[in-house]
């Protein structure tokens, strides 16, 4: 997605450890127009899949997931990372390791909002090692729901996440695919 790549070039910052900081438009300050276009793109890519719900992990996946849900006229469920006093029973859970934060979080989705005949689309801001998507897949397995695929805003193609998901038969659609973050420079995969 050209517009997204331009935003990354203009506002993205490469940090040590192959970290790409995009807090100017995605995961701190949010560019609503860009998120709308991202939602439209995912809606188009997954239009004929019979999807019933959009799933993501809080918090950076929420904006693109909500815009995708808006475009597809579908509810969005975000897996919570922190325990809630109001959501404490009848939960599907999975442990997810965060590459950038170097912590493990237990994510959870209430069984109340998951139906046995659901077909879900997972949306996430980044795909590097695939831990967030793996956590959602674990919850999908627990719930017995179908998975249409994963819509990823930014994929770090030089890390194993996308390849491992594709090997498992998971459809992965990434809007910006990064080949390298070497020398503090973002290089995109050339299609």
Swiss-Prot record:
GO terms for molecular function: xanthine phosphoribosyltransferase activity. SUPFAM superfamilies: PRTase-like. GO terms for biological process: purine ribonucleoside salvage; xanthine metabolic process; XMP salvage. Gene3D superfamilies: 3.40.50.2020. Keywords: Cytoplasm, Glycosyltransferase, Purine salvage, Transferase. The keyword Protease does not apply. One of its GO terms (cellular component) is cytoplasm. Xanthine binds at residues 20, 27, 156. 5-phospho-alpha-D-ribose 1-diphosphate binds at residues 128-132. It catalyses: XMP + diphosphate = xanthine + 5-phospho-alpha-D-ribose 1-diphosphate. Pathway: Purine metabolism; XMP biosynthesis via salvage pathway; XMP from xanthine: step 1/1. The keyword Transferase applies. InterPro entries: PRibTrfase_dom, PRTase-like, Pur/Pyrimidine_PRTase, Xanthine_PRibTrfase. It is found in: Cytoplasm. It is an enzyme of class 2 (transferase). Its EC number is 2.4.2.22. Converts the preformed base xanthine, a product of nucleic acid breakdown, to xanthosine 5'-monophosphate (XMP), so it can be reused for RNA or DNA synthesis. Homodimer. HAMAP family: XPRTase. Belongs to the purine/pyrimidine phosphoribosyltransferase family. Xpt subfamily. This is Xanthine phosphoribosyltransferase. It comes from Limosilactobacillus reuteri (strain DSM 20016) (Lactobacillus reuteri). The lineage of its organism: Bacteria, Bacillati, Bacillota, Bacilli, Lactobacillales. The gene is xpt.
């Amino acid at each position: 997605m050209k517009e997204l790549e331009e935003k990354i070039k203009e506002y993205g910052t490469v940090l040590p450890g192959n970290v790409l900081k995009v807090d100017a438009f995605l995961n701190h300050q949010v560019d609503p127009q860009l998120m709308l276009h991202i939602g439209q793109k995912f809606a188009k890519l997954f239009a004929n899949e019979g999807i019933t719900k959009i799933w993501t992990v809080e918090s950076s996946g929420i904006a693109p997931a909500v815009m995708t849900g808006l475009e597809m006229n579908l509810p969005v469920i975000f897996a919570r990372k922190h325990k809630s006093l109001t959501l404490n029973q009848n939960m599907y859970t999975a442990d997810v390791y965060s590459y950038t934060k170097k912590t493990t979080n237990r994510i959870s989705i209430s069984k109340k909002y998951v139906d046995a005949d659901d077909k879900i689309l997972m949306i996430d801001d980044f795909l590097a090692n695939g831990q967030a998507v793996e956590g959602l897949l674990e919850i999908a397995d627990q719930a017995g729901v179908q998975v249409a695929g994963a819509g990823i805003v930014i994929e770090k193609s030089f890390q194993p996440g996308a390849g491992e998901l594709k090997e498992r038969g998971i459809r992965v659609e990434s809007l910006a695919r990064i080949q390298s973050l070497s020398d503090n420079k973002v290089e995109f995969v050339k299609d």
